[in-house]
């Protein structure tokens, strides 16, 4: 829409090696004509499945670069990125492209956390102004992960409600309308680098901070 381009994954099949390609209604790519790439999907878990054509990572931290809902329990990671039982509904409303993703938090073996099935509804709205991501009720202990692509040489400003990146004579804004912004662990340069697709990013976590557990994010560039 306008200067924005995006790709969703709606796969319902797995590769032989589990936990590789994102599925589950993931936002696999977000790109802006002036700002360039904002999100670019990675393997869910970096594995050298084509070792001669891939490089290992020597950095301290390595995590996936795909936006997701995440819950960690007893060291196990549960996200929407491996859910084979996801439904995506799309409609157009006043020239806005609206996607509703009905998904679940599972591990790479399709198992739910100990408390049982964890359904999640994520809404995406694309307009000429930008992109809105909304989780009306984030499950207990879960949060939204937004790995924002940012070169280590770019100037980044982060608060509990926003992130700003000076880029290409403009500013990429990530504004948190509901929830609280935190930054996950990074290497010394303040970034996570993932060899596939080869981007550095800042791992934002958006935690619900209200009784209704709503998370709402607006992304725009000016």
Q: Language-model segments: which ranges?
A:
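Extended polysaccharide-engagement surfaces of secreted carbohydrate-active enzymes
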Residues: 1-154, 158-168
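Beta-strand-rich recognition/accessory modules
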Residues: 168, 175-222
């Amino acid at each position: 829409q306008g200067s924005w381009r995006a790709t969703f994954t709606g796969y319902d099949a797995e590769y032989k090696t589990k936990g590789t390609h994102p599925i589950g209604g993931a936002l696999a790519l977000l790109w802006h004509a002036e700002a360039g790439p904002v999100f670019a999907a990675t393997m869910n878990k970096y594995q050298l499945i084509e070792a001669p054509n891939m490089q290992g990572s020597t950095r301290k931290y390595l995590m996936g670069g795909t936006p997701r809902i995440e819950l960690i329990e007893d060291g196990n990671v549960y996200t929407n990125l491996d859910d084979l039982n996801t439904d995506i509904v799309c409609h157009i409303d006043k020239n806005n492209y609206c996607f509703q993703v009905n998904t679940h938090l599972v591990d790479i073996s399709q198992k739910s956390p100990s408390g049982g099935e964890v359904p999640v509804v994520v809404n995406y709205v694309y307009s000429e102004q930008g992109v809105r991501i909304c989780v009306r009720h984030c499950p207990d202990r879960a949060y939204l992960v937004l790995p924002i692509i940012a070169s280590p040489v770019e100037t980044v400003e982060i608060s509990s409600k926003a992130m700003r990146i000076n880029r290409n004579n403009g500013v990429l804004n990530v504004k948190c309308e509901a929830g609280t912004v935190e930054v996950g662990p990074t290497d010394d340069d303040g970034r996570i680098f993932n060899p596939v697709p080869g981007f550095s990013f800042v791992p934002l976590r958006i935690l619900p901070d209200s009784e209704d557990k709503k998370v709402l994010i607006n992304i725009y560039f000016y």
